[in-house]
Design a protein with these regions (language model features):
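A short beta-strand-to-loop transition that corresponds to the Sensor-1 phosphate-sensing loop
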Residues: 30, 83-85
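GG-anchored amphipathic helix commonly corresponding to the ABC/SMC/Rad50 NBD signature/C-loop
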Residues: 20, 28-50, 60-72
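Residue-level preference for the first positions of well-ordered beta-strands
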Residues: 47, 78-80
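Conserved D-loop beta-strand region of ABC ATPase nucleotide-binding domains
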Residues: 51, 81-82
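Conserved P-loop NTPase mechanochemical-coupling segment
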Residues: 2-28
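Short loop immediately C-terminal to the Walker-B catalytic DE motif
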Residues: 54-55
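C-terminal lobe/lid and adjacent interdomain/linker elements of RecA-like ASCE P-loop ATPase modules
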Residues: 60-78, 85-132
């Protein structure tokens, strides 16, 4: 009875994982898998801490993540996100806090260094490349 119970439990867990996440997670890219898992795990009224969630994502997928976060915020989810992504920092209604090693203070999106540097680079990439 012992091995049959263990085998049955493992088969049940495998079936539940397949139902929730799909039969072949390797069929998706790393970023697609990340977004899929995130969508499956987020529950209404949850509090979530995300550390650089943009890391496995292309810019287009970062926009998809932004939409997921916006939709979940409408379901009363709260997010604390450590990010370098100007795209994620642009989430409507986000409170951006700057941690400088000594203090934590609110900062306007347009004043965030990553936003200013990205904007300046996109406005004139040749100027930046000459200074490298």
């Amino acid at each position: 009875m012992g091995p049959a119970v263990a085998t049955g439990a493992a088969a049940g867990q495998r079936a539940a994982l397949i139902r929730r996440y799909g039969a072949d997670p390797d069929a998706r890219s790393h970023g697609e898998t990340f977004l899929h898992l995130l969508q499956q795990r987020l529950q209404p009224r949850g509090l979530y801490f995300l550390d650089e969630p943009e890391t496995p994502l292309s810019p287009l997928r970062v926009l998809a993540l932004l939409a997921i976060l916006r939709d979940r915020a409408a379901q009363d989810c709260q997010f604390v996100i450590a990010t370098h992504s100007p795209i994620l920092m642009a989430l409507p209604g986000a409170e951006i806090l700057l941690l400088d090693g000594e203090t934590i203070a609110p900062i306007d999106y347009r004043e965030v260094e990553h936003v200013r540097i990205t904007r300046a680079f996109l406005d004139d990439p040749e100027s930046f490349l000459r200074r490298l």
